[in-house]
Amino acid sequence: MPLFATPFAQLDLIRQPEQDGEPLQAFDAADEYLLNHLYERGVTAQSRILVLNDAFGALAASLAPHVQLTSSGDSHLGFLALRKNLARNGLDLGSVRFVPASETAVGPFDHVLVKVPKTLALLEEQLIRLHGQLAPGAQVVAAGMVKHLPRAAGDLLERYIGPMHASLAVKKARLLVAEAAERPAPRSPYPTRYRLEQPPLTLLNHANVFCREGLDIGTRAFLPHLPRSLGALRAADLGCGNGVLGIAYALLNPQAELTLVDESYMAVQSARENWRAALGERPAAFRADDGLAGQAAGSLDLVLCNPPFHQQQVVGDFLAWRMFLQARDALAAGGELWIVGNRHLGYHAKLKRLFRGVEQVAANPKFVILKAGK
């Protein structure tokens, strides 16, 4: 892999999760454009800089030795990538203060560098939270590859930060540069809520939760077929989102012990709040993690999963395959993984390579529900 070279540093960077023969870089031309722009503006060791949505730590690792740096994002994998890339390049892990996107990064900040996320609701919430955190004369610069940079991103900068102009494209990347101006304190439209009829739940969704406006169709297909009356099993909702699968399963299985895990901090925050609303003080574990990587081997009896098929802008089944491997390792002998997936993804064949037996629980023209026994 090529080194990431800018006026600030020359770095050897990796993506997370790692895979053999990784074809993709841990940085892009938008990262380079942002850092070149900041270098031209000039920074000192006293400059207070906030980086948002730094996918694999390219921005933070470049700036860490030079400024007072805070990084914030909603991906725990992004946090792990930042730590690994700092260590990989001999940089102090304490040189970057990391704040999960479920919390507000406290300023004041002189410069804010933003990688525009796929979910514009996350960008909107992040810009809203910048109110009162910007130093006088601060500049907020958002960047992305032109093909992934919607016009609405510039509109959000204008609304919440101040006058904005778009740069020329360089290497198919573009900057959106906003100068901080007086704006009235905004009211956030997040979290959103929607009502589920069966089971009867009102589900809260923070800004970066998948399908925050309504139940996704895969989960809708899965819910009627969740196993019930299984006793005191140890179960996990893997990639829990707002927690709906885990909560619905818990309602059907009053003695079950639940763990809800997602790599999104906002998802875990949503799941925790939804659990309390539905189940009160019933114990459960909530964890932002790299799937079940932190789960002890053989410590679960059941894993429920509606696996994702994309990481940021990259589509594929790598993450799903990794979740299946993690579930197999975390399950005790005789334990089961239950999943829902699009028919065309061929999960049945993939699960057969990992598990003792695979059965189809239910299906419709678009989705299939499978259970795989260890």
Curated annotation (Swiss-Prot):
InterPro entries: DNA_methylase_N6_adenine_CS (IPR002052), rRNA_m2G-MeTrfase_RlmG (IPR017237), RsmC/RlmG (IPR046977), SAM-dependent_MTases_sf (IPR029063), Small_mtfrase_dom (IPR007848). Belongs to the methyltransferase superfamily. RlmG family. It catalyses: guanosine(1835) in 23S rRNA + S-adenosyl-L-methionine = N(2)-methylguanosine(1835) in 23S rRNA + S-adenosyl-L-homocysteine + H(+). One of its GO terms (molecular function) is 23S rRNA (guanine(1835)-N(2))-methyltransferase activity. It comes from the Bacteria. Keywords: Cytoplasm, Methyltransferase, rRNA processing, S-adenosyl-L-methionine, Transferase. Its EC number is 2.1.1.174. It comes from Pseudomonas paraeruginosa (strain DSM 24068 / PA7). It is an enzyme of class 2 (transferase). Gene3D superfamilies: Vaccinia Virus protein VP39 (3.40.50.150). Signal peptide: none annotated. Pfam families: MTS. GO terms for cellular component: cytoplasm. PANTHER family: RIBOSOMAL RNA LARGE SUBUNIT METHYLTRANSFERASE G, RIBOSOMAL RNA SMALL SUBUNIT METHYLTRANSFERASE C. Specifically methylates the guanine in position 1835 (m2G1835) of 23S rRNA. This is Ribosomal RNA large subunit methyltransferase G.
